[in-house]
Amino acid sequence: MKIGNIDLGHEPIFLAPMEDVTDIGFRLLCKQMGATMVYSEFVSSDALIRMVNKSLAKLQVCEDERPVAIQIYGKDVDAMREAARIVVDQAHPDVLDLNFGCPVRKVAGKGAGSGMLQNVPLLLDITKAVADAVPDTPVTVKTRLGWDTPGLYLPDGTPFIVDLAERLQDVGIQALTIHGRTRAQMYQGEADWTLIGEVKNNPRMHIPIIGNGDISTKERVRECFDRYGVDAVMVGRATFGRPWIFRELQGGTLSLDEKIDILKQQVITSVERIDEYRGILHVRRHLAASPIFKGIPNFRETRIKMLRAETVEELFAIIEEIRALLKTEN
């Protein structure tokens, strides 16, 4: 599979863009675990134009994580065009991705993210403006099946996402990622891959189609490639507390000790990138969500302790207690 001139190999697996999750430290860790391409947290176009330091910091990229995509969002043509130029000039990403899928109220409720699905003409104008503004960088889009269930099909019976995919391709995108839910669903229920498959199997489409939604096992990955024919799959929430998932999805296995050591490395990376207090604050909720801790006796109390830890020493002591307990249980 290729996005522009970037060869991503056969059946690649991507790390999804996630706010307050996919910072450079986490991206590097997932890359080490086998992610083919990684995506940044989304960045506000308005904030980039205003040169807000917090948003500019999200443009930090290192060579070891390439190929890497930086994702931007917004609802103004001029702002998105200018933000795209800033991203390309400062970060030199391999791919520039446009977020037309974020369902959270503070984004979609203001007309950005998945809110753009209610204004397709503007969505297309933004996409074309960005693609024209950065012709040497592949522009891609991440979106959802539609705004809500009533809007899944056009009056003539054509699936909304099939029509949108064609129109996005026509204005210059070089790959399309589709999350298999509507905005109204948020993250409830199961992702519907049937419509993703219809986009991929549309003879008009020639750009890569990347499927996203409920990817957590190697069996599911196999089904998505074989049954729906997508060119790549993208993993999001299943990476929480489980950055090694990419190795597992490719058929690899890790011991309990290896998994716990990876979580400790995530702590170290977070602290080194920021500082001890803020690094711990950022990473501890990821550790508390790790599936390897589920099922141990009285984990609720242990989880609370983990979420209250303020130093590396304190957090590591809790992790080692859990390691010993898990070994005893096994």
Q: Where are the language model's segments positioned?
A:
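Glycine-rich, positively charged N-terminal anion/phosphate-binding segment
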Residues: M1-G4, G9, M18-D94
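Alpha/beta catalytic cores of nucleotide-metabolism and tRNA/nucleoside-modifying enzymes
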Residues: M1-G4, G9-I13, E19, I24-G25, ...
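Hydrophobic faces of well-ordered beta-strands that scaffold small-molecule active sites
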Residues: I13-P17, V38-S40, V68-I72, L96, ...
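Alpha/beta enzyme core
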Residues: R81-A112, V120-I207
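Short, solvent-exposed helix-helix connector turns and helix-capping sites enriched
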Residues: V52-N53, M116-V120, D192, G241-R242, ...
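Active-site beta-loop-alpha junctions enriched in small/polar residues
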Residues: M18-D20, V43-S45, Y73-K75, G101-P103, ...
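Short glycine-enriched, charge-decorated loop/helix-capping segments at active-site entrances
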Residues: A57, G111-L117, Q185, Q250-G252
